[in-house]
């Protein structure tokens, strides 16, 4: 409200879905009464915060996603979860046997998540560039500043969970990843109607930030993805090798979203993707004749 509006992509999505709900939540700031309990929605928040803490601890210990050993990964996960829980809800998670079980569940989900994210990175050439990038203070970003009229301006704020990049000559290829605990699939119809703006806003901001931080380089979009944080069950058969089980897990943990339909970019994201194959790490597949599948 006012002549200079400051909103997040989520707020704009809420307004597009229901203007009255937007008014109640962001105008009147109505919210549910907080209770001393740990609900299912809190589980997603804790996992998200623990994953952010893991990224910080990884950097602090001067480790990389690619070089991280299983032992180092598990130790960092335990540390990150304990640090997150200590700061969450005045130790609410330590208040009952049920919540103690939830701590173990968070650690299990996070182990599966970090393992899958490692495999996705190892499949291609991209490297994580930045984590938890806030662009609310970037006043001069064209991607987050819009002149609505002579006197009115809209400034978007937000935080990108992760930006990956691959540099070749004078070009920086960029993909953004947003961690989700629900099953919000990217839907182009929802994008068209303004109900899913987050990934597009984040990708545009990431491209502009990369060019700003690397003068003389040109940033190109490679993809925008949701990663669903979960620990899925897979159908197995007696005698299945560990490699086959991991393949099924990766299929279930594949990112969802849009990838740029260019052979070079697809190959740089998944070097094993070729004619007649479906990627285990990105939403792309080739027909036997080498054309992109309609499922891509």
Q: Predicted regions: what is each one?
A:
Residues 1-296:
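Structural signature of nuclease core domains in nucleic-acid processing machines
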């Amino acid at each position: 409200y006012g002549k200079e509006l400051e909103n997040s992509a989520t707020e704009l999505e809420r307004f597009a879905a229901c203007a009255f709900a937007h008014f109640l939540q962001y105008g009147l700031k109505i919210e549910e009464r907080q209770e001393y309990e740990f609900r299912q929605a809190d589980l997603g928040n804790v996992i998200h915060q623990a994953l952010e803490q893991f990224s910080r601890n990884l950097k602090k210990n001067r480790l990389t996603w690619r070089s991280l050993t299983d032992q180092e990964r598990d130790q960092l996960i335990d540390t990150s979860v304990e640090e997150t829980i200590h700061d969450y809800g005045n130790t609410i998670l330590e208040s009952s046997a049920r919540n103690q079980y939830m701590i173990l569940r968070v650690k299990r989900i996070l182990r599966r998540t970090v393992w899958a994210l490692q495999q996705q990175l190892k499949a291609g050439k991209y490297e994580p560039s930045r984590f938890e990038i806030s662009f609310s203070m970037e006043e001069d970003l064209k991607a987050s500043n819009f002149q609505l009229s002579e006197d009115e301006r809209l400034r978007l704020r937000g935080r990108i969970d992760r930006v990956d990049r691959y540099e070749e000559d004078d070009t920086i290829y960029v993909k953004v990843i947003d961690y989700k605990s629900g099953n919000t699939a990217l839907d182009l119809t929802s994008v068209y109607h303004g109900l899913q703006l987050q990934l597009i806003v984040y990708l545009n901001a990431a491209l502009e930030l990369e060019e700003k931080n690397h003068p003389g380089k040109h940033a190109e979009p490679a993809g925008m993805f949701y990663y669903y944080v979960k620990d899925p069950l897979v159908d197995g058969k007696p005698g299945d090798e560990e490699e086959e089980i991991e393949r099924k897990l990766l299929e279930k943990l594949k990112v969802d979203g849009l990838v740029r339909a260019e052979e070079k970019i697809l190959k740089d994201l998944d070097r094993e993707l070729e004619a007649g194959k479906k990627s285990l790490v990105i939403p792309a597949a080739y027909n036997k004749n080498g054309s992109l599948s309609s499922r891509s």
